[in-house]
Amino acid sequence: MRARTFHSWMGLLLLLTACGAGRPGADAPYTVVRTLPHDASAFTQGLIFHRGLLFESTGLYGQSTLREVDPETGAVLRKRALPRDVFGEGLALHSNRLYQLTWREGLVFVYDADTLETVGSFPLAGEGWGLAAWEGKLIVSDGTARLRFYEPASFTLIAERTVRDGDRPVPRLN
Protein backbone atom coordinates (compact mmCIF):
# COMPACT_ATOMS: atom_id res chain seq x y z
CA MET A 1 0.00 0.00 0.00
CA ARG A 2 2.79 2.45 0.91
CA ALA A 3 4.60 1.70 -2.35
CA ARG A 4 1.45 2.35 -4.39
CA THR A 5 0.83 5.65 -2.60
CA PHE A 6 4.45 6.65 -3.11
CA HIS A 7 4.29 5.84 -6.83
CA SER A 8 1.01 7.76 -7.18
CA TRP A 9 2.56 10.85 -5.58
CA MET A 10 5.68 10.53 -7.70
CA GLY A 11 3.58 10.24 -10.86
CA LEU A 12 1.57 13.32 -9.91
CA LEU A 13 4.74 15.25 -9.07
CA LEU A 14 6.29 14.28 -12.41
CA LEU A 15 3.14 15.32 -14.28
CA LEU A 16 2.94 18.68 -12.50
CA THR A 17 6.63 19.32 -13.07
CA ALA A 18 6.31 18.57 -16.78
CA CYS A 19 3.22 20.76 -17.13
CA GLY A 20 4.94 23.70 -15.49
CA ALA A 21 8.18 23.33 -17.42
CA GLY A 22 7.64 26.49 -19.41
CA ARG A 23 5.35 28.50 -21.58
CA PRO A 24 4.48 27.04 -24.96
CA GLY A 25 6.21 28.57 -27.94
CA ALA A 26 4.33 30.62 -30.48
CA ASP A 27 3.05 28.80 -33.54
CA ALA A 28 4.30 30.26 -36.79
CA PRO A 29 2.90 29.39 -40.21
CA TYR A 30 5.26 27.87 -42.74
CA THR A 31 5.29 26.39 -46.23
CA VAL A 32 7.62 23.65 -47.42
CA VAL A 33 9.00 25.05 -50.67
CA ARG A 34 11.30 22.19 -51.59
CA THR A 35 12.73 19.01 -50.12
CA LEU A 36 16.38 18.16 -50.73
CA PRO A 37 18.08 14.77 -50.39
CA HIS A 38 20.18 14.18 -47.27
CA ASP A 39 22.06 11.34 -45.62
CA ALA A 40 19.53 10.14 -43.03
CA SER A 41 22.30 8.58 -40.93
CA ALA A 42 23.99 11.98 -40.41
CA PHE A 43 23.31 13.33 -36.91
CA THR A 44 23.33 16.99 -38.00
CA GLN A 45 24.53 19.44 -35.35
CA GLY A 46 25.47 22.44 -37.50
CA LEU A 47 24.61 23.47 -41.05
CA ILE A 48 25.83 26.35 -43.24
CA PHE A 49 24.99 27.25 -46.83
CA HIS A 50 28.05 28.85 -48.49
CA ARG A 51 29.10 29.24 -52.15
CA GLY A 52 26.22 27.02 -53.27
CA LEU A 53 27.28 24.16 -50.98
CA LEU A 54 26.20 22.89 -47.59
CA PHE A 55 28.77 22.53 -44.84
CA GLU A 56 27.56 20.18 -42.13
CA SER A 57 28.82 19.25 -38.68
CA THR A 58 27.65 15.83 -37.54
CA GLY A 59 27.76 14.36 -34.06
CA LEU A 60 27.86 11.03 -32.21
CA TYR A 61 30.98 9.50 -30.75
CA GLY A 62 32.89 7.53 -33.37
CA GLN A 63 30.84 9.09 -36.19
CA SER A 64 31.39 12.86 -35.96
CA THR A 65 32.43 14.62 -39.17
CA LEU A 66 32.71 17.89 -41.02
CA ARG A 67 31.17 17.49 -44.47
CA GLU A 68 30.87 19.45 -47.69
CA VAL A 69 27.59 18.43 -49.33
CA ASP A 70 26.04 19.06 -52.74
CA PRO A 71 22.56 20.33 -51.82
CA GLU A 72 21.00 19.18 -55.12
CA THR A 73 22.02 15.53 -54.82
CA GLY A 74 22.84 15.14 -51.13
CA ALA A 75 26.21 13.69 -52.14
CA VAL A 76 29.03 14.18 -49.65
CA LEU A 77 31.77 15.82 -51.73
CA ARG A 78 34.41 15.93 -48.98
CA LYS A 79 34.49 14.75 -45.41
CA ARG A 80 36.79 15.15 -42.39
CA ALA A 81 36.36 12.60 -39.61
CA LEU A 82 36.80 13.82 -36.06
CA PRO A 83 38.66 11.65 -33.54
CA ARG A 84 36.48 8.77 -32.31
CA ASP A 85 36.35 10.19 -28.79
CA VAL A 86 34.99 13.57 -29.97
CA PHE A 87 31.31 14.52 -30.43
CA GLY A 88 30.90 17.20 -33.11
CA GLU A 89 28.47 20.04 -32.45
CA GLY A 90 27.74 23.56 -33.78
CA LEU A 91 29.32 25.05 -36.90
CA ALA A 92 29.94 28.65 -37.99
CA LEU A 93 31.73 30.41 -40.85
CA HIS A 94 33.86 33.53 -40.38
CA SER A 95 36.49 34.91 -42.82
CA ASN A 96 36.56 31.69 -44.86
CA ARG A 97 37.20 29.64 -41.73
CA LEU A 98 34.82 26.98 -40.46
CA TYR A 99 34.65 26.73 -36.67
CA GLN A 100 33.33 23.44 -35.26
CA LEU A 101 32.44 22.98 -31.60
CA THR A 102 32.80 19.79 -29.64
CA TRP A 103 30.23 18.83 -27.05
CA ARG A 104 32.16 17.85 -23.91
CA GLU A 105 35.75 17.64 -25.13
CA GLY A 106 36.64 21.30 -24.60
CA LEU A 107 37.79 21.95 -28.18
CA VAL A 108 36.92 24.14 -31.13
CA PHE A 109 38.35 22.95 -34.45
CA VAL A 110 39.12 25.48 -37.20
CA TYR A 111 39.19 24.54 -40.90
CA ASP A 112 39.93 26.30 -44.16
CA ALA A 113 36.53 26.51 -45.92
CA ASP A 114 38.14 25.95 -49.35
CA THR A 115 40.04 22.77 -48.50
CA LEU A 116 38.53 21.49 -45.20
CA GLU A 117 42.10 21.25 -43.93
CA THR A 118 42.48 21.77 -40.20
CA VAL A 119 44.22 25.10 -39.60
CA GLY A 120 44.00 25.18 -35.82
CA SER A 121 42.07 24.53 -32.66
CA PHE A 122 41.22 26.39 -29.49
CA PRO A 123 40.28 25.32 -25.97
CA LEU A 124 36.64 25.78 -24.96
CA ALA A 125 35.56 25.99 -21.34
CA GLY A 126 32.39 24.00 -20.67
CA GLU A 127 30.14 22.28 -23.16
CA GLY A 128 29.73 23.33 -26.78
CA TRP A 129 26.20 23.23 -28.19
CA GLY A 130 25.35 25.89 -30.76
CA LEU A 131 27.65 28.22 -32.69
CA ALA A 132 26.92 31.29 -34.81
CA ALA A 133 28.90 34.06 -36.50
CA TRP A 134 27.50 37.55 -36.01
CA GLU A 135 29.00 41.00 -36.57
CA GLY A 136 32.58 39.74 -36.56
CA LYS A 137 32.13 37.60 -33.45
CA LEU A 138 31.46 33.95 -32.74
CA ILE A 139 28.60 33.21 -30.35
CA VAL A 140 28.64 29.94 -28.38
CA SER A 141 25.74 28.38 -26.50
CA ASP A 142 26.29 25.68 -23.90
CA GLY A 143 22.78 24.48 -23.06
CA THR A 144 22.26 27.10 -20.36
CA ALA A 145 20.70 30.57 -20.68
CA ARG A 146 24.16 32.03 -21.30
CA LEU A 147 25.65 33.09 -24.63
CA ARG A 148 29.40 33.70 -24.86
CA PHE A 149 30.93 35.99 -27.49
CA TYR A 150 34.43 35.26 -28.83
CA GLU A 151 36.91 37.06 -31.05
CA PRO A 152 37.44 34.55 -33.90
CA ALA A 153 41.19 34.86 -34.63
CA SER A 154 42.28 34.07 -31.07
CA PHE A 155 39.02 32.66 -29.68
CA THR A 156 39.29 35.11 -26.80
CA LEU A 157 36.15 35.54 -24.70
CA ILE A 158 34.97 39.14 -25.05
CA ALA A 159 31.47 39.11 -23.53
CA GLU A 160 28.78 36.98 -21.91
CA ARG A 161 25.04 37.56 -21.90
CA THR A 162 22.15 35.78 -20.21
CA VAL A 163 19.07 35.42 -22.39
CA ARG A 164 15.89 36.24 -20.47
CA ASP A 165 12.17 36.13 -21.03
CA GLY A 166 11.16 39.02 -18.83
CA ASP A 167 13.08 38.38 -15.63
CA ARG A 168 13.43 34.61 -16.15
CA PRO A 169 16.55 33.10 -17.76
CA VAL A 170 15.78 31.01 -20.87
CA PRO A 171 17.59 27.67 -20.39
CA ARG A 172 18.76 25.06 -22.91
CA LEU A 173 19.84 27.50 -25.61
CA ASN A 174 21.31 25.73 -28.59
Residue ranges and their predicted role:
Residues 35-40, 79-84, 120-126, 161-171:
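Surface loop/turn motifs at the tips and blade-to-blade linkers of beta-strand repeat domains
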Residues 16-18:
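C-terminal motif of bacterial Sec signal peptides marking the signal peptidase cleavage site
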Residues 51-52, 95-96, 135-137:
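Short coil/turn segments that connect the beta-strands within blades of beta-propeller domains
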Residues 69-74, 112-116, 151-155:
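Short loop/turn segments that connect beta-strands within beta-propeller blades
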Residues 55-61, 98-105, 140-144:
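Conserved beta-strand positions in repeat-built beta-propeller and related beta-rich domains
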Residues 33-65, 79-92:
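Beta-strand-rich domains and repeat architectures in extracellular enzymes and scaffolds
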Residues 22-41, 71-77:
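A short helix->beta-strand "capping" segment at the edge of beta-propeller domains
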Residues 42-46, 86-93, 126-134, 169-174:
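Repeated scaffold domains used in trafficking and secretory/extracellular systems
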